[in-house]
């Protein structure tokens, strides 16, 4: 299945929507669309690529950095997150985790 991913960052001037299949990481799909997002490890082990899901659901079971409380608040590591529905994600939120 393909889902619509809506990325938003007022600070970065990002407001884009693109398709992402259920077996593609959101960060990878964004890059294929030419959208530059922050990342570092690409393995779900740091917080550089963190986003916050405001609508929809993702599967980020490969991640090893965020704690349960952060995930309940909607934080997501876009480098290892698969969409499970249409999603709206705030990007560039790493500083909010600390």
Swiss-Prot record:
CDD domains: fer2. The keyword Cell membrane does not apply. Residues 3-95 form the 2Fe-2S ferredoxin-type domain. GO terms for molecular function: 2 iron, 2 sulfur cluster binding; electron transfer activity; metal ion binding. Its cofactor is [2Fe-2S] cluster. The keyword Plastid applies. It holds the Pfam family Fer2. One of its GO terms (biological process) is electron transport chain. It is found in: Plastid, Chloroplast. One of its GO terms (cellular component) is chloroplast. Keywords: 2Fe-2S, Chloroplast, Electron transport, Iron, Iron-sulfur, Metal-binding, Plastid, Transport. Forms a complex with heterodimeric ferredoxin-thioredoxin reductase (FTR) and thioredoxin. Ferredoxins are iron-sulfur proteins that transfer electrons in a wide variety of metabolic reactions. This is Ferredoxin. The gene is PETF.
